[in-house]
C-alpha cells in the first residue's frame, strides 16, 4: 500500500539501510491472518534464503515491498538478477556481494480473496537450484575470494571430513 512508502524510504534517507524490504512475520498476532500453506512455504523459503544470501537476521524474502538506494542499485548486475519468483531471493544474494545493509520493515499480511498464481511444483526445482548456487557462490566469494581466514580453512577441512565420514559410513 502507498501509505507504507515512507516507512520503507526513511531508513535509506537516514543512512541506516541500503535496501529495505517488508516482513509480514514481524507481528506474530498478524501472522494468524496468513493462510497456513503460505505460512509454511514462506518459512521454508526464508530459511533457504538466509543460507544463500547470508542475511541471517532477515525473514520473508519473497515479500515484494522493497526500496533501494540509487547508489546501491547502480552497482547491481541487473542483467544477471533472476526474473520472476526467485527475483527477491536473488537480489538479496546480490546485495550481500556488495555488503549492502538490508533492513526488514514490519508490515501486515493482507490476503483478501486473491488467488496465488504460484505453483510450487513448477518453481521448487528453480528455487532449490538457485539457493544452492547462491550459497556456494557466497561461500566462495566471502571466504576464499575476498577474505581468506581461519574460517576458510575450517570450511575446507569440514567439507573433507564430512565427505570422508559419509563415504566411510556408507562403506561400513
What are these regions (language model features)?
Residues 2-85, 112-122:
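Acceptor/aglycone-binding surface of glycosyltransferases and processive sugar-polymer synthases
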Residues 80-172:
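Hydrophobic helical membrane-anchoring modules
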Amino acid at each position: 500500500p502507498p501509505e507504507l512508502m515512507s516507512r520503507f524510504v526513511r531508513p535509506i534517507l537516514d543512512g541506516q539501510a541500503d535496501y529495505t524490504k517488508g516482513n509480514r512475520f514481524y507481528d506474530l498476532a498478524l501472522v494468524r491472518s496468513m493462510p497456513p500453506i503460505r505460512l509454511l512455504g514462506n518459512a521454508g523459503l526464508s530459511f533457504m534464503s538466509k543460507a544463500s544470501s547470508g542475511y541471517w537476521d532477515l525473514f520473508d524474502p519473497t515479500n515484494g515491498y522493497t526500496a533501494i538506494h540509487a547508489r546501491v542499485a547502480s552497482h547491481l548486475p541487473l542483467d544477471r538478477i533472476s526474473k520472476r519468483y526467485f527475483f527477491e531471493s536473488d537480489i538479496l544474494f546480490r546485495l550481500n556481494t556488495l555488503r549492502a545493509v538490508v533492513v526488514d520493515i514490519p508490515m501486515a499480511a493482507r490476503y483478501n480473496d486473491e488467488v496465488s498464481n504460484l505453483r510450487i511444483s513448477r518453481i521448487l526445482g528453480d528455487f532449490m537450484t538457485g539457493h544452492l548456487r547462491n550459497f556456494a557462490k557466497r561461500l566462495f566469494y566471502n571466504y576464499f575470494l575476498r577474505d581468506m581466514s581461519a574460517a576458510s580453512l575450517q570450511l575446507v577441512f569440514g567439507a573433507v571430513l564430512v565427505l570422508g565420514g559419509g563415504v566411510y559410513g556408507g562403506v561400513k
